[in-house]
Structures are given as structure tokens and as C-alpha cells.
């Protein structure tokens, strides 16, 4: 799925835009015991209650493609004949109304999910989207439908345990202790099935959501989809950093790493300005080309390519945002940490002065120390 397709489905989670009829699921305690099963009509709920349920489900389509939202790809054999794909198709085709299929999915999640001492709420809801035709001018034509996209979403939400708080009593004009009750929080993970690719159902893919890019709950991916869990965004960065340092060795200089980061950010900016809805992806060969342009020898570049193919797999598509990690340029020594906005990384230089290595930062105007404006003396004043 690309960003435009994702946004199109996200807009379905409005009261006037969807065909969600019921909310299904279950409430589970930390001992993996089902406290209650949920089967409720959305239409019979109060408006604010409907909006809250739809808001939780919509959160499973939030975040960044390739980081929080991860493509799950089924093999041809799985789609042809496998219990895991058959279960998802049953839920989709019955609009999640098959009680046995619902319980089977929920049990898979409950038995595999590691949520520590936290209770959780599992929600399921199905929708049928009459996909409007998109004209040559890229405008949607609501009166010209092309296809019906039937899908369901699953949200897995941690539940906050009750605490005592002082609450104002309007009758007594006083604050009294009162329990907050069990509160469903934003989902930690969830998924959409099937994917909405080329504005149509793609039963070979699902879109998996993880709020935490470091912890994608591989155990749930394995239990529900029976596929090799993809690398998390953090794992992708760690593998890249290690491959860069280990294969370049002494050639992994400050200038090389700075150049690589600047070129990757340049690719990201160009992609953003192009307004291409598809996520930006680079091959290992593309990154190797960036290393070559940064002055790395062909021998080291080839070594880097081999290591990346070994770790990521052949023909792997790398997300440059995952490789760069956080949106900052950070330099650390045992005693000092320097953090600048990525677009200003060029301001920092590595120099050898008097036999010692230094990192130089321009300090012309606006210098502060713990919030106090200070002046930097000119050399001739020393």
C-alpha cells in the first residue's frame, strides 16, 4: 500500500463514511483469561461511543509506512491452501460474523501475545468500501464505482488498570476519591486484511501495525500469519550501522558517514517533493553507489554489499528513513554529545589540529550556556 491508498482507507473511519455495522472482540486479563466477549451493534451506540471505537480501530492505520506499518506477504502456497489464510478469508467474507473464526483468531493472539501484567482489549470490525473510480485527472468520481473492497481490521489495545483519583462531586461541592475504572488505551498493534493495493483487495498481503517500532511483537506475526517476521525499523538501522562499520573498517571515517547521511536525506527530500505516494525504497546497490560517491574504494563497497545481502536478503528493499533512524544528526564521544538538525550536519567538521583530533562547530552569534547568552572571544583577544 502507498500513502494515498492508506489515506483513502483511513477516511472510512468516520461515522458518515463507513459500513461498519458491528464491533466484535474480547477483553482479556494478564493471565490470558477471557473476561468477556464483545458483539455489539455500532448503530445502537451513542455517537461519542461509536467515535471512540472507530478511533481505536483507525489508530491501526497510523504512523509511517515501513516503520509502524509493515507489509506482511503470504506465499502462493499459503493463499492456495493454509489454515492461517483460510481463517482470515473467512473473517473477511463473513464480515467477522463467524463466531468460531473470531474465537480462533482471538485465541491465537491471546496465546502468543506477551503484554506482561497488562490486560488487553481485542477489537474486530469489517467494512465494505464501494471504491469510487479515479479519473485521469486523479479526481475521485463517487458516482462511478469500480469495485467493492471488503476488509476487516483488528486492534489490540492495552487496558489501564483503575487508580484512585480525587473527583469533584457537584452535589456536595467537594472532591472525593473515585476510581478511574479500566480504560482502553490506543492500540499497541493490529492489522488490516487484505491490503488495499492499486485501490483493490490484495489477498496476498496484510498491513501490520506496531505502535513501537522497536518492538513489533514477532510472536503475534508468527501466530496469526505464519510468515517470517520482518525486521523492525530499529533492527534495520542496527544491521546497516554494523555492516557499515565492519566492512569499511578504517575507511568508515566521519566524512564518509556524514556524506552517506546527507545523501540519504537528499533522496528522502527529493521523494517528498515529488509527491510520489509510494514509499521510498533503495536497493543495496543504490546504497553502494552512495558509498562510492562518498569516496569509498570499490573493494570496500563490494564487501558492504555482500554483508547487506547476507543480513537483509537478496534483492532487499531498504527504507532510508529506517536506516537513518531518528530525525537528528548525533555525534557522541565518551564525554560529549552533539546533536544538530540533519540539514545542519554540514556545519560540523572533523579536523586534526596540533596532533589532536577535533570536531569544529561554528559559534558566530546566538551562543548560550545553560540559557545564558555568552560571547566567544576572537583569537586576537587572547
Task: Locate the predicted segments by residue.
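C-terminal, beta-strand-rich globular interaction domains
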Residues: 278, 287-382
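Extended alpha-helical interaction scaffolds
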Residues: 2-5
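Long, hydrophobic alpha/beta structural blocks
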Residues: 11, 17, 21-325
Amino acid at each position: 500500500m502507498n500513502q494515498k491508498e492508506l489515506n483513502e482507507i483511513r477516511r472510512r473511519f468516520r461515522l458518515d463514511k463507513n459500513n461498519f455495522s458491528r464491533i466484535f472482540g474480547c477483553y482479556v486479563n494478564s493471565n490470558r483469561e477471557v473476561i468477556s466477549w464483545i458483539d455489539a451493534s455500532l448503530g445502537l451506540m451513542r455517537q461519542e461511543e461509536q467515535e471512540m471505537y472507530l478511533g481505536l480501530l483507525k489508530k491501526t492505520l497510523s504512523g509511517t509506512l515501513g516503520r509502524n506499518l509493515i507489509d506482511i506477504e503470504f506465499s502462493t502456497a499459503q493463499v492456495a491452501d493454509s489454515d492461517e489464510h483460510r481463517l482470515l478469508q473467512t473473517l473477511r467474507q463473513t464480515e467477522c460474523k463467524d463466531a468460531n473464526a473470531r474465537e480462533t483468531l482471538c485465541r491465537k493472539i491471546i496465546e502468543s501475545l506477551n503484554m506482561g501484567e497488562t490486560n488487553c482489549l481485542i477489537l474486530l470490525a469489517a467494512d465494505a468500501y464501494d471504491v469510487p473510480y479515479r479519473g485521469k485527472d486523479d479526481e475521485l468520481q463517487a458516482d462511478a464505482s469500480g469495485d467493492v473492497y471488503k476488509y476487516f481490521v483488528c486492534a489490540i489495545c492495552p487496558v489501564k488498570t483503575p487508580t484512585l483519583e480525587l473527583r469533584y462531586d457537584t452535589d456536595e461541592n467537594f472532591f472525593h476519591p473515585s476510581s478511574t475504572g479500566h480504560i482502553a488505551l490506543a492500540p499497541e498493534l493490529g492489522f488490516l486484511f487484505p491490503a488495499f493495493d492499486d485501490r483493490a483487495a490484495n489477498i496476498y498481503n496484510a498491513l501490520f501495525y506496531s505502535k513501537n517500532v522497536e518492538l513489533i511483537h514477532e510472536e503475534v506475526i508468527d501466530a496469526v500469519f505464519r510468515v517470517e517476521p520482518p525486521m523492525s525499523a530499529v533492527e534495520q538501522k542496527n544491521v546497516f550501522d554494523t555492516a557499515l562499520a565492519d566492512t569499511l573498517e578504517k575507511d568508515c571515517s566521519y566524512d564518509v558517514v556524514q556524506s552517506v547521511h546527507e545523501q540519504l536525506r537528499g533522496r528522502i527530500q527529493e521523494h517528498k517533493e515529488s509527491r510520489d505516494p509510494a514509499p521510498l525504497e533503495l536497493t543495496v546497490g543504490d546504497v553502494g553507489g552512495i558509498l562510492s560517491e562518498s569516496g569509498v574504494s570499490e573493494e570496500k563497497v563490494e564487501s558492504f554489499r555482500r554483508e547487506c545481502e547476507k543480513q537483509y536478503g537478496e534483492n532487499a528493499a531498504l527504507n532510508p528513513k529506517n536506516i537513518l533512524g531518528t530525525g537528528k544528526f548525533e555525534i557522541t564521544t565518551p564525554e560529549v554529545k552533539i546533536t544538530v538538525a540533519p540539514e545542519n550536519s554540514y556545519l560540523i567538521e572533523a579536523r586534526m589540529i596540533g596532533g589532536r583530533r577535533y570536531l569544529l562547530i561554528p559559534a558566530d552569534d546566538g551562543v548560550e550556556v545553560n540559557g545564558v547568552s555568552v560571547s566567544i572571544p576572537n583569537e586576537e583577544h587572547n
